[in-house]
Regions:
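N-terminal small/glycine-rich loop or linker at the start of catalytic domains
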Residues: 1, 22-25, 125-128
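Generic N-terminal amphipathic, Lys/Arg-enriched alpha-helix
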Residues: 1-9
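Short aromatic/hydrophobic contact patches that present stacked aromatics
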Residues: 6, 97, 320
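Conserved, mostly hydrophobic/aromatic
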Residues: 14, 37, 68, 124, ...
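N-terminal capping/small domains of soluble enzymes
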Residues: 17-20, 27, 38-51, 64, ...
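Active-site-proximal beta-alpha core segment in soluble small-molecule metabolic enzymes
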Residues: 30-184, 189
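Active-site anion/phosphate-binding pocket segments in diverse small-molecule metabolic enzymes
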Residues: 177-361
Length: 361
């Protein structure tokens, strides 16, 4: 008997989506590093990325990169988060390349490389205004580039940036053009071409679609688009040929009853300390499914495949649905299916309380 809630992973669709993105990028002279952290590094997902033709697999989590190297030793891996001092040895062993933005970390990484008799490739990160990681001043970036170029255990692979993850800044020809100019300056300093100018993540895809991507950018770190999700809708672009249902969530109906839609009594805060906004729609048929915030994060980002269903909200273990327009089609024990956003996929792929089913269709 099946167990629910369940994350259904359609590996062929992920492989197809990866191939679509790889082909789109290749037409613009850009390679794709497949970001697998959004699906918690699930190995069948990693393999689908590989089959789809990505040039490397990338994650911010060292255990995910270690698992990849243990199964596919020759697979190139990229560490997305600036490494902690406590994980430098693992970085050298399991990440072929890492993103870096701190001089002290670079010095320590170089020392560990020499102690282990290894070399390690680094991409220096530049903060172009999103205000997360990266060198903020040009002079600091250039000094770090010289440090790496002179280091015995490190190889300066290139420079990169991140846009849209914290500061909501959109990549555009201006800020990515600045990245390319910084790369050219470093190349003139060190007397050779950089292998990589990494122009961000999924949020940079619109520049490929409208032809405004600066020519110097030759790598993107792409995950959510390959993983299908509705991220493209959030960022107001669409990639033709991408499957939107490569991941689906299935949950079982545990209650169906006509109830009021506005809470009765004195309003306070919910279980998470928030003050939700409620709309009085009168009495309607509501359903409870056995999945909640602990399993999927913000359940209001779930998209019912039956468009007659609406998601009201929920709590840590329950999600509340409006079934008024389809009540006759659902009974206790029936399964309700959803596509998801990035947050939902992160939570459900990681949760031990969500079963995983891999479908090769």
């Amino acid at each position: 008997m099946s167990s629910f809630p369940k994350l259904v992973v359609h590996t062929k669709k992920i492989e197809h989506n990866a191939r679509v993105m790889v082909d789109l990028c290749a037409k613009n002279g850009v390679t794709v590093s497949g970001v697998i952290k959004g699906a918690s590094g699930l190995l069948p997902v990693c393999n689908a990325f590989r089959k789809g033709g990505v040039s490397s697999l990338s994650s911010s989590r060292m255990p995910q990169l270690r698992a990849i190297k243990e199964i596919w030793p020759d697979q190139e891996t990229l560490l997305l988060r600036i490494p902690m001092m406590c994980e430098l040895d693992e970085v050298i062993r399991y990440a072929d390349v890492s993103l870096e933005s701190d001089v002290e970390t670079l010095k320590a990484l170089d020392a560990r490389c020499l102690a282990l008799g290894r070399t390690h490739r680094v991409i220096l990160m530049v903060d172009l205004g999103d205000l997360r990681e990266g060198f903020f001043e040009d002079d600091d970036l250039y000094a770090a580039a010289k440090l790496v170029e002179d280091a015995k255990g490190l190889v300066l692979e290139g420079i990169g940036t991140n846009l849209g993850c914290y500061g909501s800044i959109e990549p555009d020809a201006k800020n990515l053009g600045r990245l390319c100019s910084q790369a050219e300056h470093i190349e003139s300093m060190i007397g050779r071409k950089l292998a990589v100018v990494s122009g961000g993540s999924t949020t940079s895809i619109p520049l490929l679609l409208d032809g405004t991507m600066p020519k110097g950018v030759n790598q993107l770190r792409v995950g959510t688009e390959v993983l299908m999700l509705d991220e493209e809708k959030d960022h107001h672009f669409e990639v033709p040929g991408i499957y939107g249902d490569a991941f689906t969530l299935e949950a079982q109906l545990i209650e169906k009853r006509r109830k009021a839609t506005f809470p009765i009594g004195t309003l306070s805060v919910d279980a998470f300390g928030n003050k939700p906004h409620y709309v009085d729609r009168g009495r309607r048929i509501r359903g409870l499914i056995a999945v909640g915030r602990q399993d999927v994060g913000d359940m209001t980002q779930l998209h019912p495949q039956d468009e007659r269903i609406k998601v009201y909200g929920g709590s840590s273990d329950h999600t509340i649905l409006d079934l008024e327009d389809c009540a006759d089609d659902y009974a206790i024990g029936d399964i309700v299916s959803f596509t998801m956003d990035y947050e939902n996929l992160m939570h459900s792929s990681l949760s031990p309380y969500v079963a995983k089913e891999f479908v090769d269709d």
